[in-house]
Amino acid sequence: QYVLNDINLLSWMGFFSMGCILIGVLLVPLTVKCFGKKQVYLAGMVLWAVGDILNYFWGSNSFTFVMFSCIAFFGTAFVNSLNWALVPDTVDYGEWKTGIRAEGSVYTGYTFFRKISAALAGFLPGIMLTQIGYVPNIAQSDATLQGLRQLIFIWPCALAIIAALTMGFFYTLNEKRFALIIEEINQRKNKEIETEEKTASVTL
């Protein structure tokens, strides 16, 4: 509305963004099967960052803005779809590491931090808009428009890159390792059952 002076663009953005998100969500099972959760998650982050950075530098008209935004929304579809899919993996990893299956604690912690992030997402933009001098329903200054573009594109892009780097370097739970972890957990459970059966037979 303020950057491109095209109020009708909002309706087109809603249509195309939902379409790209829907296509991305439908492709998640196939891409995960072919490449694994981690790689698909990273690819989604990269697409998100690329779409935002392209929009910041070259999204100067309605067509390029929608096109680059679709790239970003397509990437977020993979990221948002896999957020919940990665949680059960951490539950199994925790059980393998500690011997305790803390499923309730993991999901509770994840839900808690999602609520914290949602609260911050509603609180921080208001402060940042005030800092750049944004006043709704009036013509914005060049400095304010530049600040809006940074808020919309640069900050999300930077956070997506940080998340991708963190995931790439510190998250080592790929499909091959996860399969070995599940196998070891099952072996432990089988041994526990055998031990219990032997103990019961001796008692009898």
Please give the residue ranges for each predicted region.
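Membrane-embedded alpha-helical bundles of multi-pass transporters/translocases
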Residues: Q1-L204
